UniProtKB/Swiss-Prot annotation:
UniProt name for this protein: Large ribosomal subunit protein bL27
GO molecular function, one term: structural constituent of ribosome
Residue ranges annotated as propeptide in the record: 1-9
Domain of life: Bacteria
Keyword list, A-Z: Ribonucleoprotein, Ribosomal protein
Pfam families linked to this entry: Ribosomal_L27
Keyword Ribonucleoprotein: yes
């Protein structure tokens, strides 16, 4: 009697898993208005997390630290002391 011992093995190894493969959406932070640009009141000037840039004249700070123009005018990015920066909006003389 001829008994065959047939054993089947996987011809490919298991795929395994990884802890990578995810990423968060970009938050589109940074300057939204350039130095010297004319903006209207309420325009967003700079989106940030924390206070990288401080609000200057005629600029407000939102709850998420976004800087926005309070009046219509020209945007100016300026130094505030030795190591800080601020953005101001100066009204256009009519």
């Amino acid at each position: 009697m001829n008994l065959a011992n047939l054993q089947l093995f996987a011809h490919k190894k298991g795929g395994g898993s990884t802890s990578n493969g995810r990423d968060s959406q970009a938050k589109r932070l940074g300057a939204k208005a350039a130095d010297g640009q004319t903006v209207s009141g309420g325009s967003i000037l700079y989106r940030q997390r924390g206070t990288h840039i401080y609000p200057g004249a005629n600029v407000g700070r939102g709850g998420d630290d976004t800087l926005f123009a309070k009046v219509e005018g020209v945007v100016r990015f300026e130094r505030k002391g030795r190591d800080k920066k601020q953005v101001s909006v100066y009204p256009i003389a009519k």
